Amino acid sequence: MTEIINVTAREILDSRGNPTVEVEVAVGTGDVGRAAVPSGASTGEHEALELRDGDKGRYLGKGVRKAVANVIDEIAPAVVGLDASDQASLDARMIALDGTPTKSKLGANAILGVSLAAAKAAATAHGLPLYRYVGGAGARTLPVPLMNILNGGAHADSNVDIQEFMVVPLGLPTFAEALRCGAEIFHALKKVLKGKGAATGVGDEGGYAPSLASNEEALAVIMEAIGQAGYEPGKQVALALDCAASEFYDKKAGKYELEGEGKRFDGKGLVEYYAQLAAKYPIVSIEDGCDEDDWATWKLLTERLGGKLQLVGDDLFVTNVTRLARGIEQGVTNSILVKVNQIGSLTETLEAVRMAHRAGYTTVMSHRSGETEDTTIADLAVACDCGQIKTGSASRTDRIAKYNQLLRIEEELGGSGRYAGRSAFKALR
């Protein structure tokens, strides 16, 4: 019934105007699944390889014709005839066909497109929404949105070093109310920034990207916006940071340099800097607080703040079970960011989530800075019982599409659904 009968692919554009891969998989029932692959701006060194053409005369070298050709000429002949409902076998076939540790032969973007499209085709063939097909009957938890309303670092052209400042509406009763809260704070922040004469253009993920004096000023204006929107900081709304510390780490010197503030820290100093921010503001989560290979400072940070805050490994773990296992063994961080394109297949993504949950780590489903209208991660957040999702601000349709899908899922679940709220954060339980 769900035998794969056709696989095709094309080059489309993502939210930054860069090419990406879109795949369609057709199964014997006549159902078709379609998936578009996202792309990151600040990417971890240990991520699976996103295959680009490298032809500078076309899309500045960022074309994906090679990956598209690999889907059509290499992957399709190998998977036609397989059962799309057997996700593990399908993904294993593609991984074996590639034969490299980072999927560099066929491209993680090629493999992932087929992996996700096949899952969507199978779900439709079985008459199930994707979250129910992947997550089973127990998939009913709506995630807390970590809404990136102010951008810095690699996501914006400004002197704010920390990459993302997020509002976390954890004290609301439903996902719909949490989303409304985040949107109202987003609009209030625009007024606050305008009042200070700051720019209100938005970055890659829909958050404002003003040039502010310091990271702390960014936190201060968000706190002001929360109050102006009529919400209570700490009780109804908390804050989260994605520091993307690998972007401001000097590997040769072993120092972290916040150029916008003129500050330079060793690992111990950086941990103290975060501790001071957490003491002053209602921060519940810090992502990528240290460099992706600075395990020693990660250990210091976990020992200092791991009992109070969620410490999320993104570039550190890259949704990879080998790196995650090392983190668990060393007692580093207490949470993992989940990005399907970091590892390049649905099966491996689900394995990482299961490993994290077994170890008592929280999981945060995440978008990338280069997105499309594809809403797969909204369903996966519910399917995987992540409890949290990062999918940008309350602007840009590529971000809003995911939030709207979660609104639909909440409506469909009705009384059986629950909003994760504060319970999504282990330190707050």
From Swiss-Prot:
Main location: cytoplasm
Reaction catalysed by this enzyme: (2R)-2-phosphoglycerate = phosphoenolpyruvate + H2O
Database matches in PROSITE patterns: ENOLASE
Domain of life of the native organism: Bacteria
Cellular localization per UniProt: Cytoplasm; Secreted; Cell surface
InterPro entries reported for this sequence: Enolase, Enolase-like_C_sf, Enolase-like_N, Enolase_C, Enolase_CS, Enolase_N
Keywords in alphabetical order: Cytoplasm, Glycolysis, Lyase, Magnesium, Metal-binding, Secreted
Pfam families named among the record's database cross-references: Enolase_C, Enolase_N
Binding site residues for (2R)-2-phosphoglycerate: 163, 339, 368-369, 390
Top EC class, one word: lyase
GO cellular component: cell surface; extracellular region; phosphopyruvate hydratase complex
Catalytic residues, chain numbering: 205, 339
Cofactor(s) annotated in UniProt: Mg(2+)
Pathway(s) served: Carbohydrate degradation; glycolysis; pyruvate from D-glyceraldehyde 3-phosphate: step 4/5
GO molecular function: magnesium ion binding; phosphopyruvate hydratase activity
Record's keyword annotation contains Lyase: yes
Enzyme Commission identifier(s): 4.2.1.11
The record's free-text note on cofactor binding: Binds a second Mg(2+) ion via substrate during catalysis.
Family (UniProt): Belongs to the enolase family.
Known role: Catalyzes the reversible conversion of 2-phosphoglycerate (2-PG) into phosphoenolpyruvate (PEP). It is essential for the degradation of carbohydrates via glycolysis.
PANTHER family, sorted: ENOLASE (PTHR11902:SF1)
Protein name: Enolase
Phylogenetic placement of the source organism: Bacteria, Pseudomonadati, Myxococcota, Myxococcia, Myxococcales
Gene that encodes it: eno
